[in-house]
Amino acid sequence: SMTLITAVCILLLSFQFSFAQQSSVSIQVDASKPVGDMRPIWSFFGYDEPNYTTRKDGQKLLNELKQLSPATVYIRAHNLLTSKGDSPGPDLKWGFTDAYKEDKKGNPIYNWIIVDSIIDTYIQRGMKPLMEIGFMPKDLSSKPEPYEHTWSKGGNLWTGWTYPPKDYNKWRELVYQWVSHSVQRYGKEEVTSWLWEVWNEPDIRYWSGTFEEYCKLYD
């Protein structure tokens, strides 16, 4: 009604008048007096496509990010364990490394070539990786099909890479082999200076398993 609209307008005007009447606030900072360490939260960067790391434009961007901060710059890329799938072309959104496959007997085959090239690129620039353990390789997924995502309207993005492992012992061995390989390649001192995390945003659709199944990834 007109009466209600008038009342709302008067209320809004009163708020505006109230804010205008507020007194100014003076803040003084004594820069000569330390109050604690300033954590360089600005020196962490991340992106979806891990293979962008080794491309010309990707390396140029990493150089620029490194120059932004005197503090150590950490880089986190998704999909460091994701499989390529069956598509003949590149998976330009999510990316892949094909680090894990299984032979016909179910024996694991580890291939760290792509992962190494990504981590090498960080190390060469004095950066540190924030190693994201994920996502689920196709041959280890408890629901591998479909694995590739689709971009059509209403298409499924959250496919086989979002599911728990079909065998948690194989998952544990995969993580162990990855860390062991990293220590052999870069040295224990270097690897212990990295940050590690399990998955990305498991509270949303990046994880299609249960809460309990996610927690079991840490066992």
List the predicted regions and their residue ranges.
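Non-catalytic accessory regions flanking glycosidase/transglycosidase catalytic cores in CAZymes
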Residues: F19-L195, E212-D219
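Substrate-binding/catalytic cleft of secreted carbohydrate-active enzymes
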Residues: P202-E212
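Bacterial N-terminal signal peptides
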Residues: T3-Q16
